[in-house]
Amino acid sequence: MVSGAGSSGTDLQVVNTPPGAGDLDAGADCGAVLDVTYRDFSEAHPDFEMPFSGDVVRRGLVASTLGVDHKPVFSDTVGHPALKDSPTAIDPDWSPTVPVITSAATFNQWYNTTAGVNLELSKKLQLSESAPGTGLFGYDSSAFFPLAPSEGFGITPKGNDLGMNFLFTTEIHVHFTYGRGQKFTFRGDDDMWIFVNGVLALDLGSMHGPAEGTIDFDAQAASLGISVGGSYAMDVFHAERHTRGSNFKITTNIACFVPSVVK
């Protein structure tokens, strides 16, 4: 477990909301409901429920910019340890050796619907305001199983003692308008990569316990190439790859997201 792999974001607070987003009405184009593409996998895929050790965030598994298809680009099977209190920097003091991704070919299947490998399901995820008028929105689940045991490949891994559908990926594409003071905090497991304006803004790769990181848009504006008042893409990629926990928490003071369609 690596809490604080990024900055803590403790100035943002949000109440818990029930796990599993369900199929909600998105309403207006601009709001706090996120369109989500889930892809369900079985344990037959070599990157899911794979043997691993270390249980820490690995960075550098994906490239620092999105591909032309608006998907993460594979970079490395092993990666590098995370530098504490940074959303993307690596710790140069030690180097892991155990692979946590099999190959570029297997990784390419994570966020691309592939016959015989994964099953795609579209749902919605509702961000709820912590209290009326606070401007703080979030989603918080310590049992994040958006796919029912009857959906996709069903209960995976087969016979897991929780009887839940693990082993899936999460993909979200939105636009937002950048205003001063905005932050976006994620805490959960396993892999999480968030790109802003096509640039990697939060890197929490690999299989690990709940790890947290914060995108501070003001502090990262120059590296992300963003300016106050501009509209920018945010592309979110998550993977739940290993039993036996599944955590997913978003906390943000961005109130308005516009869904983006990526073909």
Map each language-model feature to its residues.
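N-terminal Sec signal peptide cleavage junction
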Residues: M1-S8
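Acidic/polar, compositionally biased interaction segments
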Residues: L12-K263
